[in-house]
Amino acid sequence: MEFSERKRSRKSQSFKLVSRDYHHEVYKISEFSNDVNGETKETQPIYLGDESMEIKKQITGMRRLLNDSTGRIYQRVGKEGEKLKQEPQVVDLVWPQRSNSSTEASQGLHSNSRGAWNELPTQSGQFSGQSGPRSRTFQTQPHISASSNGELPGVNSIVGSNCCTCNCQSTLQAILQELKTMRKLMQFQAVGTQNRQQPPISLMCSQRTAVSRKRNKKKKVLPKTVQPVTAVEPKPSPLETEKKPAASATRPPGLQAAERTSTEENHVLGFGIVLESPSSDPEVQLAEGFDVFMPKSQLDSILSNYTRSGSLLFRKLVCAFFDDKTLANSLPNGKRKRGFNDNRKGLDQNIVGAIKVFTENYCTANHVDKLPGPRDWVQILQDQIKLARRRLKRGSAEVADGDERLDRISLPPTGHTFVIKRETPEDPEPGSVA
């Protein structure tokens, strides 16, 4: 009989890892059969040809899938140095050949083979559910085959008859078919449980879109300002149309045309929230969330003249809200400088934030070039502060020059009188010289 040694590799003090080629669970299936008297008896499985070996390999593969995904078998071992050397001679790798100790056993195998194989699916179900060291320790115990007389059957190297091999091939094929059906059932059950746990696709899509919207709202502030503006702005449009006929009688036609174009641009672009006001010129809220308002006519004039670049629009809006004195005595980032002699204060960040949001929305909607970056806003404010200081210096210098000019204009008559006074005492000097 052909034997091959089972390879082992040391895993730990209490476990040994059997190589993946060995699958003791599979070989143990055919070790039980019924005796002639009906008693259970362990018999060695029959060595079959190449076809049967292929079927057995398929069975081992299916059992590997059903039992353990990794295919590893850990066997429990006693304490250190306790019966570790005696284990390799217990189990074989090769499917052993059938023992021909008695002809009655072969007849019993033929007569009761169908009953024995019918019991195998239940055993396979039991083996498929087992996991852990207990089931495997039971498998590693030496199997003592005993006949009805109590004698140990010998192992014979003679191959069984063709009839027996045919019967075993059919039974092996039946086992393989049942294992395949079991695997399909397990897969269907797993898919059914997953489908029960997962919500329907429509709900998943709606949840994902809601989550993505929330994330976008948290990250970006701009869409918040744009969306409500477009929804709120068309409402006051009929009020504006009612106010236009009353104001058109008093205003020239050129201003009326300019206002029409500007209002159309505002309605199309959706910027600024027009608010009702008792005066003829309504106020516009630059951005939602900021209590910053601006006369609509002034905003229309800025949008019609200074929309070449986003930085220019931002500069003009800053100049519209802050005069030169406030800019000259302020800091761009809203913080107070830590100096005892420095009285400068930060700019109102509410106004600056509203202007910034308005320019960003306008430039992105109208595709205006040169939109200021995150670091450019403070630089633009610093430039505007410097320009305001220069204007104040020039204005003070011009005022001083104007005062000097006024003094010069008033000085000649007074100088003339002084010259007359000076000439009177100088008259006797030439007389004295003469």
Curated annotation (Swiss-Prot):
Enumerate the spans annotated as BEN domain: 289-399
In-chain residues carrying the UniProt-annotated modification Phosphothreonine: 326
Instruction: Locate the compositionally biased regions of type Polar residues.
Output: 97-150
Originating organism: Mus musculus
Q: What does the UniProt keyword field contain?
A: Isopeptide bond, Phosphoprotein, Ubl conjugation
State the protein's name.
Answer: BEN domain-containing protein 7
Q: Which gene specifies this protein's sequence?
A: Bend7
Q: What InterPro entries does its record include?
A: BEN_domain (IPR018379), BEN_domain_protein_7 (IPR053072)
Q: Which domain of life is it from?
A: Eukaryota
Record cross-link Glycyl lysine isopeptide (Lys-Gly) (interchain with G-Cter in SUMO2), residues: 16, 56, 85, 244
Which terms in the Gene Ontology molecular function aspect does this entry carry? DNA binding
Keyword match Phosphoprotein: yes
- Biased composition regions of type Basic residues, renumbered to the chain: 212-222
Q: Does the record bear DNA-binding in its keywords?
A: no
Q: Which residues carry this modification: Phosphoserine?
A: 330
Region described as Disordered: spans on this chain = 96-151, 212-262, 414-434
